Each structure stands twice: as structure tokens, then as C-alpha cells.
């Protein structure tokens, strides 16, 4: 089979299974409203949970940072790309989350990949929740360590794997809030098990940080857990992009020496680090925003229950409406768009076969009438 035949066959298979992905051109903003293809929609697909991507303080901080530092970092943090703005942000994150150190990465994907690539060796073992993010599972599969996946959110399944002998070190990997189902991991029990076994726990809290816990400190803080490795990302509640790894002092120094994703990537723009400082301030003072988000979640779930909609058990901003069939999910998403609502259809391989869904995400920027409109249209399209 030639290169061209291989590529065309793969594309044809995706199209035939109604799993073909297409990008949409966003022409303005990603907040309560979104403009796509020349049309305005109520946006129920974004991850900007607190509305900070449109926050005036955050925008002004970025502009001021650009005036001070320019629009780019100019290099890796190991060369000339590590600025005062980066240093201050790392210290603020470490103090806020109760860790000795924080290290910035250009994305959550890069942070997850870097940790597993740098830390794991051939005699080690990774125990990953079966529904962990693609960045975690891919990095684990490509690492020299052995990968074993345990049943989703089942501590006993993890305990069984921890009991098996291992010549090296064991790292258990999970998420704080799972991106496709919106459910939360039993972090306290998982950490109890890993500590007892002498293993480490790594938590990717991309969807929990900023939203859960005191001052938005996330899922781990909410459950009274401080894992050995905590990854927080800035593309959701922070309203920007990038990520940080929270860890102890020796691990941070080790990563600075051996994490290739950190060493060989251009650092995030200092202006972005300045904006993230402003976003962190908003999050720490954001009890009202978090309360508004929780009100929206409760309003939606109560209305969905009255309509007998099939949702997951999520009590987070991620509210998946289970459909099953790929084409049916696409058709429903199109019906919602025709009524001015933007909701994404999620299909395999992002979710398991037969697990197609509308991934509804709620934010603090939504108004009660927005939630009511969404429920009204869902009722009309006969989900």
C-alpha cells in the first residue's frame, strides 16, 4: 500500500463511521457567545469555566506584559526565555497550591508527556485509569515503563495492580475531573493506596483547578490530597493556555535537567505569564464566579431531569448528554446550531465505541435564560 493509499483509506474509514473531525473558524471570542461561519451562537462547547478569557483585568495584564517584554519569550527557559513574569507566576502557583515548586509548560499535553518521559524507566510500571486523557495514555504507552490500565475510578482495581511485584518504581496516574464524562476521581482513596504501596500518584487536574476547592485550588485540595505530582492547566478556568507541574524541590530540579519538552521548547510569552498572574488573582477572589457556575449546573441538571435526558452522573461544568450513535450525535448538534446554540458532538475514538454524546459545558458567564433556552431546544429536538 502506497503512502497516498494509506492516507486515503484512513480518511475514508473516518468518514464512513461518521467520526471525521472538522475545524470551525472562530471569528470572534470564545465566551458566552461565539461567532462561527458568520453566525452568532450561544456557546456551550468552551472550557472557559469562569469566563476569564474575556476578563478585562486579564486582558490588560497581557497588554502590559507585551509592552514590557514584547510578544515572545525569545527562546527556551534554559537559554533566555525565563523572565521575571515566569518566575513570579511559578512562585505564586507553588504558594497557592502548597508545593515547594512549580514549573511552567507550554501546554497540559506537553507537561503530561514530559513527566512520564523523564521519570519512567524500563523496570518501572505506570498504572493509569482507563479513561485518562490521551496525553497521559500516549506518553505511558511510549515510555520504557510497563503500562497497566485499571477500571475507571475503581480503587480496588488499582489496589490489585499495586499488589503485583515490580522491580522498579510505580506511578499511578489519574485525572481530577474526567474531560468526557465530567466525573471526579476518588483521589483520597487512590492516594491512600499508593502511599501504602510506596508508589507515587500523579493527578492531571485540568478541569478541576480554578473551579473546585477553597479559592479554586482544585480537586486535590477539595479532597484533602497532595499527590506527589500535580498537573494544572491554564486552558480551562484560567481562560488562557499553558500548564504547570507542582512537585517537590528535587523533582523540579530533575525535570529541569531531563524533561526534554521543557528544555527544547520555546517558553510561553512573558505577557502570557503576566496574564496568568491576573487570572490567578481572579480565581483566588472568585467565589462569586464559582457560585454562579454551580447555580448554572444545578439549573441545567434539574431541567434535564424533568425532560428525562440521559446525562452522566457529573456534577461539574462538563455535562455530557449520551446519544450512542455517531450520526445521531452529529444530527442533534446540527439541530441545535440551527436554533443558535453551539454544542459539540463527541465521537469515537475520543470516547469508546457506542459512546457518542453532546458534550455540554457550562460556565459562570452563562445567564439563567441561556440555560433555559438550551433546555427548551433540547426538548424540541426530541433527544
From Swiss-Prot:
The keyword Ribonucleoprotein does not apply. Pathway: Cofactor biosynthesis; biotin biosynthesis. InterPro entries: Aminotrans_II_pyridoxalP_BS, Aminotransferase_I/II_large, AON_synthase_class-II, AONS_Archaea/Proteobacteria, AONS_Proteobacteria, PyrdxlP-dep_Trfase, PyrdxlP-dep_Trfase_major, PyrdxlP-dep_Trfase_small. Pfam families: Aminotran_1_2. The modification N6-(pyridoxal phosphate)lysine is found at residue 236. Its cofactor is pyridoxal 5'-phosphate. It catalyses: 6-carboxyhexanoyl-[ACP] + L-alanine + H(+) = (8S)-8-amino-7-oxononanoate + holo-[ACP] + CO2. NCBIfam families: bioF (TIGR00858). Homodimer. This is 8-amino-7-oxononanoate synthase. It comes from Serratia proteamaculans (strain 568).
Amino acid at each position: 500500500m502506497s503512502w497516498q493509499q494509506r492516507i486515503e483509506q484512513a480518511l475514508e474509514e473516518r468518514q464512513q463511521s461518521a467520526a471525521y473531525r472538522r475545524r470551525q473558524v472562530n471569528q470572534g471570542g470564545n465566551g458566552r457567545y461565539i461567532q462561527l461561519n458568520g453566525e452568532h451562537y450561544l456557546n456551550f462547547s468552551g472550557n472557559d469555566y469562569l469566563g476569564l478569557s474575556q476578563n478585562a483585568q486579564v486582558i490588560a495584564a497581557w497588554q502590559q506584559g507585551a509592552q514590557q517584554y514584547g510578544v515572545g519569550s525569545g527562546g527556551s527557559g534554559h537559554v533566555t526565555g525565563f523572565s521575571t513574569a515566569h518566575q513570579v507566576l511559578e512562585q505564586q502557583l507553588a504558594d497557592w497550591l502548597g508545593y515547594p515548586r512549580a514549573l511552567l509548560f507550554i501546554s497540559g499535553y506537553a507537561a503530561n508527556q514530559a513527566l512520564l518521559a523523564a521519570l519512567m524507566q524500563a523496570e518501572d510500571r505506570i498504572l493509569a485509569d482507563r479513561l485518562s486523557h490521551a496525553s497521559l495514555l500516549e506518553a505511558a504507552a511510549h515510555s520504557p515503563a510497563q503500562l497497566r490500565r485499571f477500571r475507571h475510578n475503581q480503587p480496588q482495581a488499582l489496589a490489585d495492580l499495586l499488589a503485583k511485584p515490580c522491580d522498579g518504581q510505580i506511578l499511578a496516574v489519574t485525572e481530577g475531573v474526567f474531560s468526557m464524562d465530567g466525573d471526579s476521581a476518588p483521589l483520597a482513596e487512590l492516594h491512600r493506596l499508593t502511599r501504602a504501596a510506596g508508589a507515587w500518584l500523579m493527578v492531571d487536574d485540568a478541569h478541576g483547578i480554578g473551579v473546585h476547592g477553597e479559592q479554586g485550588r482544585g480537586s486535590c485540595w477539595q479532597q484533602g490530597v497532595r499527590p506527589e505530582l500535580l498537573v494544572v492547566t491554564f486552558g480551562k478556568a484560567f481562560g488562557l493556555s499553558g500548564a504547570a507541574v507542582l512537585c517537590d524541590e528535587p523533582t523540579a530540579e530533575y525535570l529541569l535537567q531531563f524533561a526534554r519538552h521543557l528544555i527544547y521548547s520555546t517558553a510561553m510569552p512573558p505577557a502570557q505569564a503576566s496574564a496568568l498572574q491576573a487570572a490567578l488573582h481572579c480565581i483566588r477572589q472568585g467565589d462569586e464566579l464559582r457560585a454562579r457556575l454551580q447555580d448554572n449546573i444545578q439549573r441545567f441538571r434539574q431541567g434535564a431531569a424533568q425532560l428525562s435526558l440521559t446525562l452522566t452522573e457529573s456534577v461539574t461544568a462538563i455535562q455530557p448528554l449520551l446519544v450512542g450513535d455517531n450520526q445521531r450525535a452529529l444530527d442533534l448538534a446540527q439541530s441545535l446550531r440551527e436554533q443558535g446554540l453551539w454544542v459539540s458532538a463527541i465521537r469515537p475514538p475520543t470516547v469508546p465505541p457506542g459512546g457518542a454524546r453532546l458534550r455540554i459545558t457550562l460556565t459562570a458567564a452563562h445567564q439563567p435564560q441561556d440555560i433555559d433556552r438550551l433546555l427548551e431546544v433540547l426538548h424540541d429536538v426530541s433527544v
